[in-house]
């Protein structure tokens, strides 16, 4: 009887763990979608509120799209990995008259009769897929962190003069409430409201009370976009990438199936993200040195 109860409890815990992992993946997908949507909202609000350039909007939207779904499928990466290897293979064909010619891209006879070549090719393809994913991750890291840091530095070094369209006629009361219409002087203002580029006019979006408060809000938007994009990058390119990140195991047994809301969706250690990128750079340097020495 005790053996039956212990077996039933073991089967129940295994079933709960399986359902728990399925619920966890579902929550992870929802988390990625929500972070991606939040990033698009912040990028759009910054463009609308502070009249950022269209190129800034397009660049950040492209980066946001790439880090939301960073890697192609393994099947596509495997085709890319085997493309160069197939081009380097040559096969020998015998023409009438006994003349032999090598054809590039043709399987050699030694590959056709070697049973171990398939397993070796599989290992080589897996290594190539991991290498390509790490190269993609390194590129997106610079697009996510380096590009956002560049925008922040440029925003601090070159602040926006929000009162330039007023031509020195700054109001003394609580903000520019009754600025003349742009249809008479074309100063880029409409009753104190900003007129953005690309035929965009936000009704009710007034000028800030001072240049300091306006530029401070812009810097806060820049940091918010940086935090959201770097968190999304850490989630999609490190934690959920199945490359070199090992999620810490739970000390307590999984007694829940995830439907009670007790689910640890993901742990996002930002310091391990930096370590993973630095390790990718060291591995690439070692591979280049090894290839040069050969």
From Swiss-Prot:
Q: Which residues lie on this side of the membrane: Cytoplasmic?
A: 1-139, 237-294
Q: Which UniProt keywords apply?
A: Cell cycle, Endosome, Golgi apparatus, Membrane, Transmembrane, Transmembrane helix
Can you tell me where the transmembrane regions are? 140-160, 216-236
How this chain sits in the membrane, per its record, is: Multi-pass membrane protein
- Induction (record text): Expression is regulated by the metabolic and meiotic transcriptional regulator UME6.
What's the main place this protein lives?
Golgi
One annotated GO biological process: localization within membrane
Q: Where does the record place it?
A: Golgi apparatus membrane; Endosome membrane
Q: Which GO terms describe its cellular component?
A: endoplasmic reticulum; endosome membrane; Golgi membrane
Role of this protein: Component of the Golgi/endosome-localized DSC E3 ubiquitin ligase complex involved in the targeting of the DSC complex to the Golgi apparatus and endosome membranes via the AP3 pathway to ubiquinate Golgi/endosome membrane proteins. Competes with VLD1 to determine the subcellular localizations of the DSC complex. May be required for cell cycle progression.
Q: What quaternary arrangement does the UniProt entry report?
A: Component of the Golgi/endosome-localized DSC E3 ligase complex composed of at least TUL1, DSC2, DSC3, UBX3, CDC48 and GLD1.
Write down what this protein is called: Golgi/endosome-localized DSC protein 1
The organism of origin for this protein? Saccharomyces cerevisiae (strain ATCC 204508 / S288c) (Baker's yeast)
């Amino acid at each position: 009887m005790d053996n039956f109860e212990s077996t039933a409890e073991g089967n129940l815990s295994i079933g709960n763990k399986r359902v728990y992992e399925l619920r966890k993946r579902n929550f992870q997908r929802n988390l990625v979608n929500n972070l991606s949507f939040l990033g698009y909202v912040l990028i759009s609000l910054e463009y609308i509120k502070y009249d950022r350039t269209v190129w800034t909007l397009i660049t950040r939207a492209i980066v946001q799209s790439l880090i939301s779904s960073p890697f192609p499928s393994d099947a596509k990466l495997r085709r890319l990995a085997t493309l160069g290897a197939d081009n380097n293979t040559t096969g020998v064909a015998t023409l009438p008259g006994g003349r032999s010619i090598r054809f590039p891209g043709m399987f050699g006879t030694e590959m056709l009769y070697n049973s171990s070549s398939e397993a070796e090719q599989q290992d080589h393809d897996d290594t190539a897929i991991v290498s390509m994913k790490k190269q993609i991750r390194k590129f997106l890291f610079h697009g996510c962190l380096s590009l956002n840091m560049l925008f922040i530095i440029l925003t601090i070094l070159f602040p926006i003069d929000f009162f330039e369209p007023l031509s020195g006629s700054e109001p003394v009361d609580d903000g520019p409430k009754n600025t003349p219409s742009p249809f008479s002087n074309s100063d880029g203002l409409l009753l104190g409201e900003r007129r953005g580029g690309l035929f965009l006019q936000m009704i009710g979006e007034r000028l800030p009370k001072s240049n300091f408060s306006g530029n401070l809000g812009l810097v806060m938007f820049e940091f918010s976009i940086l935090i959201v994009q770097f968190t999304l990058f850490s989630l999609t390119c490190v934690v959920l990438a199945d490359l070199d990140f090992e999620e810490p195991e739970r000390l307590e047994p999984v007694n829940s199936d995830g439907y009670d809301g007790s689910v640890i969706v993901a742990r996002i250690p930002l310091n391990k993200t930096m370590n993973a990128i630095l390790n990718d750079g060291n591995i690439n340097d070692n591979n280049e040195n090894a290839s040069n020495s050969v």
